[in-house]
């Protein structure tokens, strides 16, 4: 018997009922009448006997009452019968299985499914689907409904493919699962049946796919037919446009990668070309920029120690020239800019200390293609990593020390006598705080120098005195600031040792 799940409050009621009827549970015969002692009076059991109460309790607990629990009478039997009948019906429904194909009923039902019966059905009721044919045969054949669905379908399809040879009727599939019957000539029955079966197989294979394809296309077309049509047009022209754009992008990237190595050189070379006219400009600049130009000239004049400071002198010459805005340049001043541009590069190749040549080299040699190209490449490489702010800080710090040699760019071309005094007066008028002409090698030698730079100062004093004597013999107007050595002596002989060079660079970094 099936057990019934009870809730907590129902369990409490059952416990109370069991406690009240515990004393009345005694086996009784079915024909005996209930005793007065078994009558239960109270609000819960009004007018009920003990047997009825016990029977009801048995039904609630187990779902079916039995005669052993008491004198159940008709109520217990009827309750048990109702429950059992419902369960039996459910069991029959669940336990229903199609009959075996080898059973006599199945064989009799299969023999009744004939092409003649199907021909009569289809000719009378028109094209029908398989489900409607199955329903009609179920009504006509008693045992046909007990067969399995697959067995029913196989019987129907076999009869349709065989055809009604007696009546010369063939069955054709017209699509959507519907079948129709048509008469043919008796002598052409076999041929028509074969052709019809081949056509039916094709319709079965292609018809379903076409139906699905058409239905899916119709749904898609109804939702976004026009949108898809619009998208097809740009998609056709998209490959050509994308290829064109990609080719341009690749070409431009290749050009950038090819020019990446010489990027700084080209930019700086163009800047130097644009700045070159400012060196030989005839028209003076505005008065508002003169003070700034003079201040930069003062700061850049004493830079002549290391490669880094000599690099800044190239930038100072390219930006401004002291005599370019004070007076119109003479015939020789036009060459002075490029000459000053060449002197620092030669000094960088020969020594770490800026050494200028006292005599003027040939004009053609100075303006040769190799020297100009080397100078511009060297200046462009150094200017790429050197900033003006760093130059200004180094110059302002080095200017306060009197231990370094102050070397100005040499004048390689002497202007005529009538123009030279004007340039000198302008140079003297530029500085109010100190006279640059009075500063020379003797004044620097008299100053106290650190021990690590003593040899360097004596070396510069000797070279400066020699250059001073040579310049006085060559021209009475020679500037005392230009210190150099004769061309007969190679400049590399005057380069300091490695220890002095290292000490000089260390002092410049500390300052």
UniProtKB/Swiss-Prot annotation:
<dbReference type="GO" id="GO:0001228">
    <property type="term" value="F:DNA-binding transcription activator activity, RNA polymerase II-specific"/>
</dbReference>
<feature type="compositionally biased region" description="Gly residues">
    <location>
        <begin position="64"/>
        <end position="82"/>
    </location>
</feature>
<dbReference type="GO" id="GO:0043565">
    <property type="term" value="F:sequence-specific DNA binding"/>
</dbReference>
<dbReference type="GO" id="GO:0005737">
    <property type="term" value="C:cytoplasm"/>
</dbReference>
<dbReference type="GO" id="GO:0000976">
    <property type="term" value="F:transcription cis-regulatory region binding"/>
</dbReference>
<feature type="compositionally biased region" description="Basic and acidic residues">
    <location>
        <begin position="380"/>
        <end position="393"/>
    </location>
</feature>
<feature type="region of interest" description="Disordered">
    <location>
        <begin position="206"/>
        <end position="227"/>
    </location>
</feature>
<dbReference type="GO" id="GO:0005634">
    <property type="term" value="C:nucleus"/>
</dbReference>
<keyword id="KW-0963">Cytoplasm</keyword>
<protein>
    <recommendedName>
        <fullName>Protein STB3</fullName>
    </recommendedName>
</protein>
<comment type="similarity">
    <text>Belongs to the STB3 family.</text>
</comment>
<dbReference type="Pfam" id="PF10330">
    <property type="entry name" value="Stb3"/>
</dbReference>
<feature type="compositionally biased region" description="Basic and acidic residues">
    <location>
        <begin position="417"/>
        <end position="429"/>
    </location>
</feature>
<dbReference type="GO" id="GO:0071333">
    <property type="term" value="P:cellular response to glucose stimulus"/>
</dbReference>
<feature type="compositionally biased region" description="Polar residues">
    <location>
        <begin position="394"/>
        <end position="408"/>
    </location>
</feature>
<feature type="region of interest" description="Disordered">
    <location>
        <begin position="298"/>
        <end position="501"/>
    </location>
</feature>
<dbReference type="InterPro" id="IPR018818">
    <property type="entry name" value="Stb3"/>
</dbReference>
<feature type="region of interest" description="Disordered">
    <location>
        <begin position="1"/>
        <end position="82"/>
    </location>
</feature>
<feature type="compositionally biased region" description="Basic residues">
    <location>
        <begin position="9"/>
        <end position="20"/>
    </location>
</feature>
<feature type="compositionally biased region" description="Low complexity">
    <location>
        <begin position="446"/>
        <end position="471"/>
    </location>
</feature>
């Amino acid at each position: 018997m099936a057990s019934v799940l009870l809730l907590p409050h129902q369990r409490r009621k059952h416990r109370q009922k069991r406690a009240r009827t515990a004393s009345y549970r005694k086996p009784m015969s079915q024909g005996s009448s209930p005793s007065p002692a078994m009558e239960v009076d109270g609000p819960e059991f009004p007018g009920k006997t003990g047997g009825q109460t016990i029977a009801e309790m048995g039904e609630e607990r187990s779902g079916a009452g039995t005669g052993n629990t008491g004198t159940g009478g008709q109520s217990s039997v009827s309750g048990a019968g109702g429950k059992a009948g419902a369960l039996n019906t459910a069991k029959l429904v669940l336990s229903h299985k199609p009959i075996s194909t080898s059973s006599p009923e199945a064989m009799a039902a299969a023999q009744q499914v004939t092409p003649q019966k199907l021909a009569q059905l289809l000719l009378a009721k028109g094209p029908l689907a398989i489900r409607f044919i199955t329903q009609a045969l179920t009504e006509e054949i008693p045992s046909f409904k007990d067969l399995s669905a697959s067995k029913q379908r196989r019987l129907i399809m076999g009869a349709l493919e065989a055809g009604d040879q007696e009546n010369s009727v063939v069955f054709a599939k017209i699509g959507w699962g519907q079948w129709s019957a048509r008469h043919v000539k008796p002598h052409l029955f076999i041929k028509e049946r074969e052709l019809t079966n081949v056509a039916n197989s094709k319709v079965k294979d292609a018809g379903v796919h076409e139906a699905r394809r058409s239905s899916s296309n119709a749904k898609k077309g109804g939702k976004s037919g026009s949108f898809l049509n619009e998208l097809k047009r740009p998609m056709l022209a998209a490959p050509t446009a994308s290829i064109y754009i990609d080719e341009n992008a690749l070409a431009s990237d290749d050009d950038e990668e090819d020019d990446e190595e010489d990027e700084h050189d080209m930019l700086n070379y163009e800047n130097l070309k644009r700045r070159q006219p400012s060196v030989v400009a005839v028209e003076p600049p505005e008065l508002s920029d003169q003070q700034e130009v003079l201040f930069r000239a003062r700061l850049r004049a004493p830079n002549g120690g290391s490669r880094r400071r000599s690099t800044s002198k190239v930038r100072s010459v390219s930006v401004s020239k002291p005599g370019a805005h004070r007076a119109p340049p003479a015939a020789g001043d036009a060459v002075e800019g490029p000459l000053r541009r060449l002197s620092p590069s030669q000094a960088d190749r020969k020594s770490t200390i800026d050494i200028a040549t006292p005599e003027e080299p040939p004009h053609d040699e100075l303006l040769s293609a190799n020297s100009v190209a080397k100078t511009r490449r060297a200046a462009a490489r150094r200017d790429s990593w050197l900033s003006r702010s760093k130059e200004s800080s180094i110059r302002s710090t080095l200017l306060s020390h009197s231990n370094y040699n102050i070397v100005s760019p040499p004048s390689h071309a002497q202007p005529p006598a009538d123009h030279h005094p004007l340039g000198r007066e302008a140079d003297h008028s530029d500085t109010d705080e100190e006279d640059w002409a009075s500063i020379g090698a003797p004044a620097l030698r008299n100053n106290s120098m650190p021990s690590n730079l003593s040899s360097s100062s004596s070396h510069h004093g000797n070279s400066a005195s020699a250059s001073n004597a040579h310049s006085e013999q060559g021209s009475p107007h020679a500037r005392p600031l230009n210190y150099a050595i004769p061309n007969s002596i190679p400049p590399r002989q005057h380069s300091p040792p490695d220890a002095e060079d290292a000490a000089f660079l260390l002092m410049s970094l500390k300052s």
